[in-house]
Structures are given as structure tokens and as C-alpha cells.
Amino acid sequence: ASRGLGDVYKRQADGHHRAASAVKVGLKRREEHPDYTGEEEFNYFLSVLFPDEELMIMPYNRVVKDLNGYSKEEFIKKIEEKFEIEESAAAVEPAYKAEFGMYLDEKWYKLKAKKDILSDDPVDGLDVAILQNNLLEPVLGIHDPKTDKRIDFVGGIRGLLELEKRCHTDCVLAFSMYPTSIAELFAVADAGRLMPPKSTWFEPKLRSGLFIHKIEE
């Protein structure tokens, strides 16, 4: 809960996993201090509020280290079951929802999700979920993107060239994403659901280390 904001309607846009960790720490401290009043430092964590019209969501792109044992030809044939694929002469920055760019073997491809894998569910309908549920997990074997070391994430602010650079060094495959919208974010929150990991790259971002506060001496 937050104080002094009256009837301002608030939604958490980022840092869900860090907030959950802070809650776990707070609950643990409460167990250790059964006489807590609610005013102790461990009952709070730092947050910042922005008006939604001043926030910009950029895509959170993906890079993958291998093709899970598939050859390039086998991999493309496999994903053609769920996506329409078109080779592109230029880098692909998706212009529409359910559209993805794919960089593989120094070539860009445009992927479009087939209608039968689209969903009206506020979470499963997100582009990050479409890619995860229909390609990253079933084809590449990436079941948990939070912990799988074969996948990494690149903020959209770093551009498409960064994806190409990664594929020339430690990765072989990259996906450029269409950014999640504020409306989609609100729909997930209003449904009482959680956003998938690495769904959004928010700007502006606060500098790290602006505030440091000890919970206990």
C-alpha cells in the first residue's frame, strides 16, 4: 500500500519479481519480530510513480545460444508449423502485434503468428507469450526463460544492430519483438495476473544506486 496519494489508481508496471522478493524479506522479518508495529523499515520498499502518458514501453528482444540440435533448415521447417516466414533484405523491426523479426545465419526473417495460435487471454495473447509458448519452449526447449542460460534479453533501446552483434559472438539466433502496449499491461493487471518475464522495457529508467537504505543496523 502507498500513503498520501488519495484516490490515485496505481498499477505496478515493472519490478514485479523484485517486489515479490521484498515482500518475502518483509514477511520473514515479521516472523523474527512478532511484536512488529508495521512502521519498521522492513515493511516498505522504494518505488517511483509515473503518469502512464509519460511512460514509454520499448520491446524486450531475445537472443538464443543454439538451435536445440536442429539444423537451420530443420529449425525453419519446424517453426513454419506455427508462423508464416518471409525472408527480409533489411533488419526487421516488427510493425504490428503478433509479428516478429528473426535473425539467423546472417539473414533477417519476418515471422507472423498464424491465427490459430492467437489468444484473447490477456497473458497468453501477449507477443512474448506467443513466442514463448509456440517457439521458444516447444522447439528450442526453453521451458523457463528466467533460469535457462541458453537465452538472454536485450532491451529495445539498444537497437537491432545489437542483436546482430550478439549473433556474431555468443549467440546464433535473435528475435526482435513488437513492444507490449500500456493497454495490454493494464489488462493483465486488471485480471489479477502476472506479466511473463522480460515482457517490457520501460523508459525512462532511474539510475541505479540513487538511493541506498539499510533495513537493519
Question: Where are the regions that the model predicts?
Answer:
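Short mixed-charge
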Residues: 29-41, 147
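A conserved active-site cap/scaffold subdomain adjacent to cofactor or substrate pockets
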Residues: 36-90
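C-terminal catalytic or substrate-handling cores of phosphate/nucleotide-
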Residues: 72-141, 151-171
